[in-house]
């Protein structure tokens, strides 16, 4: 039987022997918690980015594999001119976990035909979470009253854009306090730990 003495048994990210093996023993706990946090973010984003994309539809016979369409081809091959699917989904997952929300602008274009034409999806662009705000149009300024819009400000050009919800894919974490936006994973973990510490002292 072959064995490899360099292989360590399973250990957590804060295991002292593991940290020593990685050459980061003696590091302050606050720094270690940051290292652990971002290591977990990296693992989550890379795992999601590697997952295959499958396209389904609801039919009278139940859920079945659907025929590929333009959106599916973009997600599978190249969401936009700057990103591969793995880079795209990795960035989406990082924004979702770290900021609580990830936003993707669905850019469309009008394809003119001999008689009329049609709107098609051209590409998909990630809007950094820190630069995007959810807006509920109570007064009907942008359209029908009560509709949801996404206000995005380009930090490089300084220009702002307002997109209807139909043109934005919004991914949020599993915990939401208003039903519209997700809470950052860091805040969820902090609240959980503080709750456990509080119960331990009761």
Predicted features and spans:
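Structured, contiguous alpha/beta core segments that scaffold functional sites
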Residues: 1-201
């Amino acid at each position: 039987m072959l064995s490899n003495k360099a292989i360590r048994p399973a250990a957590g990210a804060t295991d002292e022997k593991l940290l020593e093996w990685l050459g980061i023993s003696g590091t302050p706990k606050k720094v270690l918690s940051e290292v652990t946090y971002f290591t977990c973010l990296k693992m989550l984003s890379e795992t999601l980015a590697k997952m295959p994309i499958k396209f389904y539809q609801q039919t009278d016979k139940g859920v079945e594999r659907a025929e590929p369409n333009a959106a599916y081809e973009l997600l599978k091959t190249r969401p936009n001119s700057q990103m591969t699917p793995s880079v795209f989904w990795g960035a989406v997952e990082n924004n979702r976990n770290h900021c609580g929300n990830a936003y993707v602008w669905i850019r469309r274009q009008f394809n003119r035909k001999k008689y009329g034409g049609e709107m098609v999806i051209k590409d998909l662009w990630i809007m950094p979470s820190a630069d995007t705000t959810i807006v509920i149009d109570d007064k009907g300024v942008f359209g029908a009253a009560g509709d949801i819009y996404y206000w995005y400000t380009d930090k490089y050009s300084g220009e702002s854009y307002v997109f209807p919800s139909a043109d934005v894919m919004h991914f949020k974490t599993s915990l939401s306090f208003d039903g519209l936006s997700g809470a950052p994973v860091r805040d969820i973990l902090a609240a959980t730990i503080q709750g456990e510490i509080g119960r331990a002292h009761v």
